Amino acid sequence: MKSSRDEAVGHHSISSFEVMLSALFIMLMVFSIGLIAVSWLAVKESEGDAALGKSHEVRGTFKITSGVTYNPNLQDKHSVDFKVLAFDLQQMIDEIFESSSLKNEYEKSKVFQFEKGSVIVLFDLFFAQWVSDKNVKEELIQGIEANISSQLVTLHIDLNSIDITASLSDFTTAVPVTTSDKLTTSSPMTTSASLGNLSTTVAATTSAPLCNLSTATFATTSGHVSIECQPGSRPCAHAWNCVATDLFCDGEVNCPDGSDEDTGLCATACDGRFLLTGDSGVFQADRYPRPDESGVVCRWIIRVNQGLSIRMNFGSFIPHYTDVLDIYEGIGPSKILRGSFWETDPGTIRIFSNLVTVTFLIKSDEYDYIGFNATYSTFNNSELNNYEKIDCTFDDGFCFWTQDLDDDNEWERIQVTTFPCYTGPRFDHTYGNGSGFYISTPTEQGWRSERVGLSSLSLDLTSEPVCLHFWYYMCCENVYNLNIHISSAETTDKIVFQRKGNYGRNWNYGQVTLNETGEFKVVFNAFRNRGCSTIALDDISLTNGICSQSPYPEPTLVPTPPPELPTDCGGPFELWEPNSTFSSPNFPDKYPNQASCIWNLNAQRGKNIQLHFQEFDLENINDVVEVRDGGEFDSLLLAVYTGPGPVKDLFSTTNRMTVIFTTNMETRRKGFKANFTSGYYLGIPEPCQDDEFQCKDGNCIPLGNLCDSYPHCRDGSDEASCVRFLNGTRSNNGLVQFNIHSIWHIACAENWTTQISNEVCHLLGLGSANSSMPISSTGGGPFVRVNQAPNGSLILTPSLQCSQDSLILLQCNHKSCGEKKVTQKVSPKIVGGSDAQAGAWPWVVALYHRDRSTDRLLCGASLVSSDWLVSAAHCVYRRNLDPTRWTAVLGLHMQSNLTSPQVVRRVVDQIVINPHYDRRRKVNDIAMMHLEFKVNYTDYIQPICLPEENQIFIPGRTCSIAGWGYDKINAGSTVDVLKEADVPLISNEKCQQQLPEYNITESMICAGYEEGGIDSCQGDSGGPLMCQENNRWFLVGVTSFGVQCALPNHPGVYVRVSQFIEWIHSFLH
């Protein structure tokens, strides 16, 4: 029997309609969740894309309104008109950005099109990392407004027409992750543990990062785990690691599971290959790109057995001009770029390593270019004999010769003379037609002096001499120097062959006998100046035995065309009033190069001279007018003028003035026109009354205001010399004298305190007081009683005598100086020498000079106080009119690390050349440089001590030198790391014997070894010669001059600082 309760809890059967509704509800729920998930992924993807996108290339345009005229040839990229204008504009753009705040990011520019409308220029700019379009545009406008480039003298660019936009190749899109980073349409970002299907979002850039994956999901036994990596890195496939994107597919394993070098991941789109092993193989970029493959980077790693080297042959090489092939020695981040090729066939490339990286950047989207086909094979350079290492016609690449990585530019392998200079050989020497190759210094116009080096492999010791044969070409007006030197462990760069000058458009034969006692390398060095010139080499070979007499006549230099005007002005000219107007030769037309002119201006005895330049326009720095007070050989330096005018009037203190005009071999300008007048006290202030003091600037103040602790003179000269030791000695002890109304009073001992001692020592520019003691007076006054006011100032009371005839004898400590906070044992030498440790020489200063928007290290200096440097006068001669172009870098160790926290930069605001400096006789070569702001002393910045006046440093004593100058003769550039050396002092008599061509005076001191090898060199000028006494270092000399660098029996010559102590102290106190 059933109750009603039992019926209530029974099961109700579900109808088909209810089943349909339930299924529909579940489907809607799944669909909604899917929509939410897809939307979330899309948002995250767009956020990731925005965070990871980088722009390395921008496209720009501007309009040239004057200075160039449009013509149809500008539409033809192969025409001379197009190439010339594109070359000039690229140089202009490069100069602007290389002097801008983007100079570290900027790489290069490419002008690719001109359009009509005056002349509209379209160009691409390439940067190493992302920069904003706005920033690029602002820097370009500022550079044009500032006339940074010389091209802007003739070209006028409409600033309103400048437009910068991101290049289409820089937009971030989703692509497969392979070494071929190509641009495709956007797709959802997915990551699988299967490397072959791995995909991510990347940006194709000039630096070719392989991918920028920030998130990956992996299947595990417990489910899916997501790994998130920082921008610029991506996860490994089967490990909990993130690795920098640019470390993927670089030949070195960085992921624990090796997935960053997986051949499936890294296979190129060019040919499907990545890792090439075995003794031979092929790789290619054939018939590229397909329409969907612009912006591709292909990379191959070649790895062969240890001990072998790699030879690559390029059977064909026909890329688009924007596409670049780079070949590196080695793999990973430490690989070394050995060659970049675009448009020019690489031929045969040999890399002396078993590891090679090859990258091919395809930026074009045109399908008409074939690309390249290459093969590689191995060789063992240890099996080569000396003749195989040397012999080369350059038809088989560079054979076994290598480019010098430490030089300033690279040799180019070419066939015929090339644009834009056309100064090279018409054909090679081997065949004498267009089928052969030779190597040449860079074919473009040089913008600086530079060295280009070529080195052989190490040659084995031979039992007999060998003869090196070669053909060389040196042309044209701006060509400089070709030399061959021998480099070995036993020899310091021995020069065995050298030619200088223009030998015309001819191949010339050269030979030299080599007879070395150990392994050695042969190095060709070509030096070229600014402008167009070519040095070329071909047909280098080696034969047994001493060189026989050359079968070819000795080449002769092309005669230098005579100057349009005589360089000798015919003087010296003696000028008297009324014949008081004179000018540079040929004024107002251009003066001649290499001119040397002297005018002696004369006035009646008792009068002086005022010199006025009515017009003045010289080439800056290279051409100068020097004005001296007095006769030519017994005068003081008044001024050195250069560059465009106007310049200030000058006044002599005697009745004679000397004007010297010299020019160099480069640019000629209009010159100058000047006149002079004579009179009494011209430019000299009226003398003051008897009860007045005359300031240095000529103004007069009441005598009562002298030495009252308040500067009444605008130049502060009334408070400059108010206390001294008796008779003005520069020692640190003695009786104290005070200047009261221009009369020196001796201080009494009465009421003298320790506080007064410290204050007096401070006023004397010394350290704290060491001791003071009363002594009995032995002479007449006048005297002064000294008391101290509550505010610390001194109260001076003149007196006829002192209490108990007691005077004060004070001794002050020297200021802290010459103390190293970081010690180091001095190593062998500067030329070819040893690196100093950071902080080893904290008073050594690097002087950089800005010329044409480039800062270049020219000289050294020594810090002698918190705001004064001592350097050489010849460093700042010609470069003294605008002191702010000089920057002093203190605490510097490496030039490549100017941003080190130990480094302090200060602008120079005043330069004072010693008035006795004579550039022609090289005497009194010393100058003072004032820093705009004082520096604080640290472990890396300290002052050096100054010697006592006329202090003697005995010959034979070992002292030290330091600097960033050349470490090799003809090195061509300064070194990166500060060098140091020990050198012995030698007597002036011995120095005069070894340097008979110079007059070694008492204001000079010499140092060096008889055998040479250790010396200061170019770039060290102005730096210190330092000797140590009582654990403190003293500035004994200032690097001045020498004959080349480190030659035997040719010591370095330095300014003897002890002869200039009074002059130096006049600036410090």
Swiss-Prot record:
PROSITE patterns: CUB (PS01180), LDLRA_1 (PS01209), LDLRA_2 (PS50068), MAM_1 (PS00740), MAM_2 (PS50060), SEA (PS50024), SRCR_1 (PS00420), SRCR_2 (PS50287). Residues 227-268, 686-724 form the LDL-receptor class A domain. GO terms for cellular component: membrane. Gene3D superfamilies: 2.60.120.200, Low-density Lipoprotein Receptor (4.10.400.10), SEA domain (3.30.70.960), Spermadhesin, CUB domain (2.60.120.290), SRCR-like domain (3.10.250.10), Trypsin-like serine proteases (2.40.10.10). Residues 830-1069 form the Peptidase S1 domain. It is a single-pass type II membrane protein. Residues 1-18 are cytoplasmic. It catalyses: Activation of trypsinogen by selective cleavage of 6-Lys-|-Ile-7 bond. Its EC number is 3.4.21.9. PANTHER family: ACROSIN-RELATED, TRANSMEMBRANE SERINE PROTEASE 15. This is Enteropeptidase.
